[in-house]
Amino acid sequence: MTDKTILRALKGEVLPTPPVWLMRQAGRYLPEYRATRAQAGDFLSLCYTPDLAAEVTLQPIRRYGFDAAILFADILLLPQALGLDLWFETGEGPRMSTVTSMEGVKGLKGKDDIHDKLAPVYETCKILSRELPKETTFIGFAGMPWTVATYMIAGRGSKDQAAAHKFKDTDRAAFSALIDAVTVATIEYLSKQVEAGCEVVKLFDSWAGSLKGQDFEDFAVEPARVITAEMKRRFPGLPVIAFPREAGQGYIGFAEKTGADCVAIDNSVSPDWAAENVQKGKTCVQGNLDPSYMVTGGQELVEATKKVVAAFKNGPHIFNLGHGITPEANPDNVTLLMETIRKG
């Protein structure tokens, strides 16, 4: 029996106190993160400098004692390794060169040619597997093919993923080839993370909610199923957390369809609904406090936290936010969150 509570929850154990970690727990809300990022010079340099990436991963563990650390990286490192240019515009977010044709898909690097660029990420994993406290679970991650493809097609983030939908609907063959290429590369990327020490992998599909009907099945469910099945074939017993953000009704049965051990849910659905329809006493659920409470704090944070814990108490549960913690969050509110959960 492991003493790592997150691994126990992922195996379906119902724990008296849910284990906790937060998406983007290593981030700009922490002064120590801002100092380390300044030392790195820019965001991508931080991702590609193993000592500094490991340091920012460890900072929230030291400060709060979270039950898991998640590798500090970015979902767009993979398309960069596939050969696209990636840069960050101040105040604007990521920008990339684009893939908008079958010719562009064929021009991507092969799955075995991505590792030189990603070698610093694997080195970060090795450092963390040595330095993390023995009770802390180490989570690796990647973006899911649909979400990664939306950036590769548009060259930037967008609210409606219009460019990706247009490509999908006008050149299905090229779009499907792109999804397949990203799927294959994602498996190789995650495999190297696990070989370097990650104990769990999380699949982030941040824009899954924009896929409807059969498209959701084809481009959110199916890639998650393929990736999960192959990762479990290569690494028997490896737990997988899937996060099809804003899937709504699509959360129902997602674990069963994909083989994921846990479904992470956002805060657009209520904890009670998710407990009844997704968790059902047996499926591990991760989530789903509204990140805005990390900004506002106070008694409202305490009550909302207790509500999430109470909703999921009869099944396996990992406490997290419904989305990443924001730069405006107050570090003291995270302390209050942890005290509220741990006191029960």
UniProtKB/Swiss-Prot annotation:
GO cellular component, one term: cytosol
Stored PROSITE patterns: UROD_1 (PS00906), UROD_2 (PS00907)
Catalytic activity: uroporphyrinogen III + 4 H(+) = coproporphyrinogen III + 4 CO2
E.C. designation(s): 4.1.1.37
Residues annotated for substrate binding in this entry: 24-28, 43, 74, 151, 206, 323
Swiss-Prot/TrEMBL site (Transition state stabilizer) positions: 74
SUPFAM superfamilies documented for this protein: UROD/MetE-like
This protein's UniProt keywords: Cytoplasm, Decarboxylase, Lyase, Porphyrin biosynthesis
One BP annotation, GO: protoporphyrinogen IX biosynthetic process from glutamate
Classification via InterPro entries: UROD/MetE-like_sf, Uroporphyrinogen_deCO2ase_HemE, Uroporphyrinogen_deCOase
Biological pathway: Porphyrin-containing compound metabolism; protoporphyrin-IX biosynthesis; coproporphyrinogen-III from 5-aminolevulinate: step 4/4
Compartments, record wording: Cytoplasm
GO molecular-function terms, A-Z: uroporphyrinogen decarboxylase activity
EC class of the enzyme, as a word: lyase
Family of this protein: Belongs to the uroporphyrinogen decarboxylase family.
Subunit field text: Homodimer.
Job of this protein: Catalyzes the decarboxylation of four acetate groups of uroporphyrinogen-III to yield coproporphyrinogen-III.
Protein name: Uroporphyrinogen decarboxylase
Species this protein is from: Rhodobacter capsulatus (Rhodopseudomonas capsulata)
The gene coding this protein: hemE
